[in-house]
Swiss-Prot record:
Binds 2 heme b (iron-protoporphyrin IX) groups per molecule. This is Probable superoxide oxidase CybB. It comes from Yersinia pestis. It comes from the Bacteria. Heme b 2 binds at residues 45, 137. The keyword Transport applies. One of its GO terms (cellular component) is plasma membrane. B-type di-heme cytochrome. Catalyzes the oxidation of superoxide to molecular oxygen and transfers the extracted electrons to ubiquinone through the two hemes.
Length: 176
């Protein structure tokens, strides 16, 4: 049994975090950018969202191949249960958010760009559905900030208070 997650799992974990930060920054800060930059910032947001979806699906498939390394010392069953619930909430959020985002853009019936490519859209716009989906997208996005914060806080609690290897299992190897 390995003491750490695989390099691939660690890489995906931190890459998803980076993409979430870029997606959030590009959409939240677009109002501060010159008007000519706004389509570019939206494209970054859309591209990051699609990349997050692909990486999260990949991460779930990899999870089936590589067992979760044990936490040492072993935490209580309640803590393990809460961790499992927290991880599945994160997986669901970061799969649902991009899917809903893609559905919003599709329903608007106008061209949108991801990765520099024109993406498909509905021939007939359905703005009511797009607006409803956008409300869910915003709600889930705001929930995700809270969940990410709890996830980071739990990792720090494990490291500094419980003094187990939870955080170390997901850290890249030291060079040297």
């Amino acid at each position: 049994m390995h003491k750490k997650y695989s390099c691939l799992q660690i890489g995906i974990h931190w890459l998803v975090l980076l993409l979430v930060i870029i997606a959030w920054s590009s959409i939240e800060l677009r109002g501060f950018a010159p008007r000519s930059y706004q389509p570019w910032m939206k494209m970054i947001h859309f591209s990051c969202g699609i990349a997050i979806l692909v990486l999260m699906m990949t991460r779930i498939l990899i999870q089936l191949r590589y067992p979760t390394p044990p936490i040492v010392p072993k935490p209580s069953p309640m803590i393990v249960g809460l961790a499992h619930v927290g991880h599945w909430v994160i997986y669901l959020l970061f799969i649902a958010l991009p899917i809903i985002g893609i559905a919003i853009l599709y329903c608007r019936g106008s061209s949108w760009i991801a990765f520099g490519l024109i993406m498909p859209h509905a021939e007939q716009a359905n703005f009511d559905l797009a607006d409803t989906l956008k409300a869910y997208h915003l709600l889930l996005a705001n929930m995700s900030y809270f969940v990410i914060g709890l996830h980071a806080l739990a990792a720090l609690l494990h490291h500094y208070v419980l003094k187990d290897n939870t955080l170390l299992r997901m850290m890249p190897k030291k060079r040297g």
